[in-house]
Amino acid sequence: MGWPLDAAEPIGTEASGRRQLQGVDWHRRNPACRRARMVAHGRDRQVRGLGEREAVRAVRAATAVGLLVLAVVLAVAGYDLLQRRHAILRNFPIIGHLRYLLEAVGPELRQYIVTSNTEERPFSRDQRRWVYTSAKGSNTYFGFGTDNEVEQASNYLIVDQATFPLPRPAAEVNDLPCAKVMGAARGRRHVFRPPSVVNVSAMSYGSLSGRAVEALNRGCASAGCLHNTGEGGLTPAHRFGGELVLQIGTGYFGCRGPDGRFDLDRLAEVAASAPVRAIEIKLSQGAKPGLGGVLAAAKVTSEVAQLRGVPVGRDCVSPSAHTAFSDADSLLDFVEGIAAATGLPVGVKSAVGELGFWQELTRLMRDTGRGVDFVTIDGGEGGTGAAPLAFSDHVALPFKIGMSRVYGVFAHAGLAEDVVFAGSGKLGLPDNALFAMALGCDLINVEREAMLVIGCIQAQRCHTGRCPAGVATQSPWLARGLDPASKAERLASYVANLRHELLQLAHACGEPHPALVTTERLEILDGHYGAARATEVFGYEPGWGLPSAADCAQLRQLMGRQSVAA
């Protein structure tokens, strides 16, 4: 309560000053005011005390964290100085780890920042963009023209279009059945015409996560194409509606007896339990021929180990060769035994090295009446979950050379029209797929392209079990990021778009189906302003690469009915 001032007395006069001082003195002498001041002063001290204690605690916490960080840094530095494996770390403790960090994220940095649209490998940015946009159902067109130096490019494909092409197929038309009926030439009980020329190649559960395999199987069911199980066997992740090609590897996973050897009864039982349309015997793989399959220890979880019958947490290495047969003759006995027990078409998958095996195989097929129903040629540039670099880079012929040589062996033996040929090894792009079909492929198997569709970012960590996209991993945390239902839709969209663009290319060449496009329509640039037809480059004779006359006529009828229906 202040001392009242005279309203008439101007502020700042001597009298007003005396009255203000008297008011202050009165406040000091007043007991109530003194008590109020003491209470306020206590509160101030209490607040200041709380603030000081909080500050002390914060300082102590920061000091503890700092000491902990310092201890960790010193421990790492000590380890770096004492270890003997890495010279960089011995010479530059702590900061030397930056080198390994940059090395670890190098693929991602190059992918998004450094490289051009066409130079990255194994799939360039342009190729990945086409795959991704096809999967999303987005615009797959590119503007402004090609990025490629066409005239200076060596081994560059040019498609010779027809002057009077067929009408452009409607956007919704993408049905492309196989030109041949699988198993018909050998009279198998369960012959069938594969409904799609584009199918998903062998990628086993274990190498891929269960959610990834489920997404692929669901997508195949939607797209009406075949899903190869891979050598890991038929698992619960393969039972979501997609029709299957059951692969038998050298480890015989899923069809082995207690002794680890092949069990025909077990195979027949497994094949009858799911929509298996064909059985593929894996002789070798393009990325690592001469070696068996390798599943890194990080991927051998308890579930994978139980399905394969192998120890948990240890590298699962398949033998380099089969124990059920040892040459072409015993292989054909093995094939015929499986076909008799299951009624299914049976074929082989192989990389291409020596041609002697193929010559012996075709001789026996011609002379004995035994034979394979299909042959899958896997190019040396094909994918793998894990392989030695020397094998991936230098063992086995690339697809186009290998395919043309094997096809030539079958053609000279008069058997090319009786066998369905499938190809794999970076064929999931329209131009590569058309090239393969002109060389005689009836089916195109896509592998890494399918992985890109369901989330792969080409991080190239498949062999570590730490795939960041949840595709090639067994980590539950990483795999949970992959939603099978949505990724299945993307796979179906990708397959449909690839078939549609293949159909567009065929129509541009004046043919209703890509299986009818021959090597005469393809030219290969030599990088020196010259070109040669693929017929000459690969030594093809007239009619090679085409189905039989009867199959061609039937295929034209099928495509004609599809065109009318559209």
What are these regions (language model features)?
Residues 246, 254, 297-326, 385-400, ...:
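Glycine-rich tight-turn/loop motif centered on a GG-T
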